[in-house]
């Protein structure tokens, strides 16, 4: 039997003070039985004003706790059918003062957050944090059609959920967990992030721009622009995209799970935005944005399901001239762990039928992505792996990725999808890359390196100047909006004063006319005109400020446009510069000479002060190779060490290693790939025959060529000093 109840959302964190209380975290959803309010003497309508009720007794749907919580800490959402609890009487009790928003955010971060920031959890080409991917995949596998998904609380308490989230992702097995526990862990994950998926700065901007936006579609375009701002890490946008895909998938089976776009947006917009100061009107705007994103954005992009493949024709080495027994690492078209952006670059302006294979961005072991050129566009096709078999869709019939690719080099992919009537004709070979370096002697190549590096630095400075203008203009726009709001309030006060004076002036003017007191009449009229004149001045000032704001908003958009136009040039210049640098490095050019061409101020060969290369501690692998140590142990080993101190360990990614190095006082981590061509940090730099050879090279070559934030060499093995 169900009873009528009410739903509330927590606006602030609250730490329970008595045994009968429950904790509140920002965004928690709570339900209160109507009968419990009636028993306390409250009538219909008062439920919408929890701050006037005082203390409420209810159920926290997010944490699974039941008890008392302060009405000043929550906002009313609406009515809901619930299972009736037994209300318990309680003596009168004073309410705590609701904290200010700024304090709440800080407290929330300290008390609730146990997860690192999204920018620290993953990096492109990954599409989302590994832990989030695991949770979503497990939920979709177990509960896609569950009619109580995300609305029924499991028996797990917050501490147990946090313990689950703290587990090592690689070894985490979610098969044993009930779907409702997984759903609670999913919501707890979103709550425990130090910053919401849609940052507060974006939410604030969305709400402040509300008067200028005409439709929800404009809101969505504005959201995309704000969250893609250079000041916000790209991981936030990727995570939002991943979550929207999950919500869309749920909404596709809403006839069974009852989770349509509206319900999902009401459930998750508080967790995605986490914006406590929004009015009910603004909250509805934010809910509507998520609803439209779920129901339209992904509905348009979702591809039609793939047709089941026909049984493959038997192929042999004899009749197709291809070797199905070749290892994947040796295949010229297999590029390993490269990003989608790099793939797009390699396939740009190529003929239909051009293809390559890379590791799938989901990082599920054995899954890959085939990227194929068709109709002038890149088509991404997932290669699945299960029970030792590979294929594009069930049933998986190929024994290896090589066998699968070789099959479709002879047969059209129309067997798999009628719209893909093309064969895999032209592999993009990792062994035959375009020869960017045309010059044939070291001095000539060095001069070209200097030219490209100079162009790159000029473009970088131009981009930095634009970014400073972009930030300054954004701040000025915000200040002008605040000033306009202040003008509006001032005008409102003056107009009210003017109306009051006008009302009373009529009475006094009539009185003074009867008395023949012309002086007082003139004084009243003068004061009234003075007040009207002041209002007119303020209105003019506001109008001028609004005109300035429009001009500055146009300038802001123009700066944004110019920044976006410079980005491709920056990427291309850096890529070309790095290829020249790699060519010179392979020819054995010393860092001193490279510094001269790169225009670095400190061109002295710092390594000439060190003993001969043979005396370097790097030759002893025990000084830097720590074996199967994990990320946390690596950070503990390197904490407090000087810049350039490093170690190499086995990576959680099978067959690879990780380098951990101190940069600007912080420990950074980067993957070392192991490929058919050798070890390296990225294609086409995977050239070193051993880890030792790679370490010796980067002992005098900066890692900055692979990552702008890693301007450091592998100078000091972590155990070197202890062994001296």
Swiss-Prot record:
Residues 3-79 form the SH3 domain. The modification N-acetylserine is found at residue 2. One of its GO terms (cellular component) is nucleus. GO terms for biological process: cellular response to insulin stimulus; insulin receptor signaling pathway; insulin-like growth factor receptor signaling pathway; intracellular glucose homeostasis; negative regulation of apoptotic process; phosphatidylinositol 3-kinase/protein kinase B signal transduction; phosphatidylinositol phosphate biosynthetic process; positive regulation of D-glucose import. PROSITE patterns: RHOGAP (PS50238), SH2 (PS50001), SH3 (PS50002). The keyword Transport applies. The modification Phosphoserine is found at residues 154, 279, 608. The keyword Transport applies. Residues 84-99 have a biased composition (Pro residues). It holds the Pfam family RhoGAP. Residues 113-301 form the Rho-GAP domain. The record marks 151 as: Arginine finger. The modification Phosphotyrosine is found at residues 467, 580. Keywords: Acetylation, GTPase activation, Phosphoprotein, Protein transport, Repeat, SH2 domain, SH3 domain, Stress response, Transport, Ubl conjugation. It comes from the Eukaryota. Residues 333-428, 624-718 form the SH2 domain. InterPro entries: ISH2_PIK3R1, PI3K_P85_iSH2, PI3K_p85alpha_SH3, PI3kinase_P85_cSH2, PI3kinase_P85_nSH2, Rho_GTPase_activation_prot, RhoGAP_dom, SH2. Residues 79-112 are annotated as: Disordered. GO terms for molecular function: 1-phosphatidylinositol-3-kinase regulator activity; enzyme-substrate adaptor activity; ErbB-3 class receptor binding; identical protein binding; insulin receptor binding; insulin receptor substrate binding; insulin-like growth factor receptor binding; phosphatidylinositol 3-kinase activator activity. Polyubiquitinated in T-cells by CBLB; which does not promote proteasomal degradation but impairs association with CD28 and CD3Z upon T-cell activation. Phosphorylated. Tyrosine phosphorylated in response to signaling by FGFR1, FGFR2, FGFR3 and FGFR4. Phosphorylated in response to KIT and KITLG/SCF. Phosphorylated on tyrosine residues by TEK/TIE2. Phosphorylated by FGR. Phosphorylated by CSF1R. Phosphorylated by ERBB4. Dephosphorylated by PTPRJ. Phosphorylated by PIK3CA at Ser-608; phosphorylation is stimulated by insulin and PDGF. The relevance of phosphorylation by PIK3CA is however unclear. Belongs to the PI3K p85 subunit family. The SH3 domain mediates the binding to CBLB. Heterodimer of a regulatory subunit PIK3R1 and a p110 catalytic subunit (PIK3CA, PIK3CB or PIK3CD). Interacts (via SH2 domains) with CCDC88A/GIV (tyrosine-phosphorylated form); the interaction enables recruitment of PIK3R1 to the EGFR receptor, enhancing PI3K activity and cell migration. Interacts with PIK3R2; the interaction is dissociated in an insulin-dependent manner. Interacts with XBP1; the interaction is direct and induces translocation of XBP1 into the nucleus in a ER stress- and/or insulin-dependent but PI3K-independent manner. Binds to activated (phosphorylated) protein-Tyr kinases, through its SH2 domain, and acts as an adapter, mediating the association of the p110 catalytic unit to the plasma membrane. Necessary for the insulin-stimulated increase in glucose uptake and glycogen synthesis in insulin-sensitive tissues. Plays an important role in signaling in response to FGFR1, FGFR2, FGFR3, FGFR4, KITLG/SCF, KIT, PDGFRA and PDGFRB. Likewise, plays a role in ITGB2 signaling. This is Phosphatidylinositol 3-kinase regulatory subunit alpha. It comes from Bos taurus. The gene is PIK3R1.
């Amino acid at each position: 039997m169900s009873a009528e109840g009410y739903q509330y959302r927590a606006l602030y964190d609250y730490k329970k003070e008595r045994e009968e209380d429950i904790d509140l975290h920002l965004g928690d959803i709570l339900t209160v039985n109507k009968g419990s309010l009636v028993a306390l003497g409250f009538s219909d309508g008062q439920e919408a004003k929890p701050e006037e009720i005082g203390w409420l007794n209810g159920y926290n749907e997010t944490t699974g706790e039941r008890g008392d919580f302060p009405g000043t800490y929550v906002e009313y959402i609406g009515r809901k059918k619930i299972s009736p609890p037994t209300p318990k009487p309680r003596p009168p009790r004073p309410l705590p003062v609701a904290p200010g928003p700024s304090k709440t955010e800080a407290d929330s971060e300290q008390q609730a957050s146990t997860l690192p920031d999204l920018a620290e959890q993953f990096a492109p080409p990954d599409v989302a944090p590994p832990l989030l991917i695991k949770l979503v995949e497990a939920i979709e596998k177990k509960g896609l059609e569950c009619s109580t998904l995300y609305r029924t609380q499991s028996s797990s308490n917050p501490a147990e959920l946090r313990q689950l989230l703290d587990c090592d992702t690689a070894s985490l097995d979610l098969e044993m967990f009930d779907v409702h526990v997984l759903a609670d862990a999913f919501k707890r994950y979103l709550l425990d992030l130090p910053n919401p998926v849609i940052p507060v700065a974006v939410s604030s901007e969305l709400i402040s721009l509300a008067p200028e936006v005409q439709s929800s579609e404009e809101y969505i375009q504005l959201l995309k622009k704000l969250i893609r701002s250079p000041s916000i890490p790209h991981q936030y946008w990727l995570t939002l995209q991943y979550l929207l895909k999950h919500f869309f998938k749920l909404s596709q089976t809403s006839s069974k799970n009852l989770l349509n776009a509206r319900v999902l947006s009401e459930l998750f917009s508080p967790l995605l935005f986490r914006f406590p100061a929004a009015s009910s009107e603004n909250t509805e705007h934010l809910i509507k944005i998520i609803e439209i994103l779920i129901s339209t954005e992904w509905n348009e992009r979702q591809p039609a399901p793939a047709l089941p493949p026909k049984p493959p024709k038997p192929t042999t080495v004899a009749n197709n001239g291809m070797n199905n027994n070749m290892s994947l690492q040796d295949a010229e078209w297999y590029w390993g762990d490269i990003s989608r952006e790099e793939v797009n670059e390699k396939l740009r302006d190529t003929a239909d039928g051009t293809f390559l294979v890379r590791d799938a961005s989901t990082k599920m072991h054995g899954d890959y992505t085939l990227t194929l050129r068709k109709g002038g566009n890149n088509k991404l096709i997932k290669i699945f792996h299960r029970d030792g078999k590979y294929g594009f869709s069930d049933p998986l019939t190929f024994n290896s990725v090589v066998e699968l690719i070789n099959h479709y080099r002879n047969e059209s992919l129309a067997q798999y999808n009628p719209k893909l009537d093309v064969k895999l004709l032209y592999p993009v070979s990792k062994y035959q890359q375009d020869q960017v370096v045309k010059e044939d002697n070291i001095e000539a190549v060095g001069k070209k390196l200097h030219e490209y590096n100079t162009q790159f630095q000029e473009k970088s400075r131009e981009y930095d100047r634009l970014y400073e203008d972009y930030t300054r203009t954004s701040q000025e726009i915000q200040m002008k909006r605040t000033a306009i709001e202040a003008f509006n309030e001032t005008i409102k006060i003056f107009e009210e004063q003017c109306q009051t004076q006008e009302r009373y002036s009529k009475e006094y003017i009539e009185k003074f006319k009867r008395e023949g007191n012309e002086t007082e009449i003139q004084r009243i009229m003068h004061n009234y005109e003075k007040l009207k004149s002041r209002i007119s001045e303020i209105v003019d000032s506001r109008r001028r400020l609004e005109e300035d704001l429009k001009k500055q908003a146009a300038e802001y958009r123009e700066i944004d446009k110019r920044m976006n136009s410079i980005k491709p040039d920056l990427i291309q210049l850096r890529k070309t510069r790095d290829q020249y640098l790699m060519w010179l490095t392979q020819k054995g050019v010393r860092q001193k000479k490279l510094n001269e061409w790169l225009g670095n101020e400190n061109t002295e060969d710092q390594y000439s002060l060190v003993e001969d290369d043979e005396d370097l501690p790097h030759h002893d692998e025990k000084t830097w190779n720590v074996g199967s140590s994990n990320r946390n142990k690596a950070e503990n080993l390197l904490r407090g060490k000087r810049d350039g101190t490093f170690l190499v360990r086995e990576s959680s990614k099978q067959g690879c290693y990780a380098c951990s190095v101190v940069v600007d006082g912080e420990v950074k981590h980067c993957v070392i790939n192991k490929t058919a061509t050798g070890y390296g940090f990225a294609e086409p730099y995977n050239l070193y025959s051993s880890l030792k050879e790679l370490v010796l090279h980067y002992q005098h070559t900066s890692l900055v060529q692979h990552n702008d934030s890693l301007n450091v060499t592998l100078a000091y093995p972590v155990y070197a000093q202890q062994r001296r």
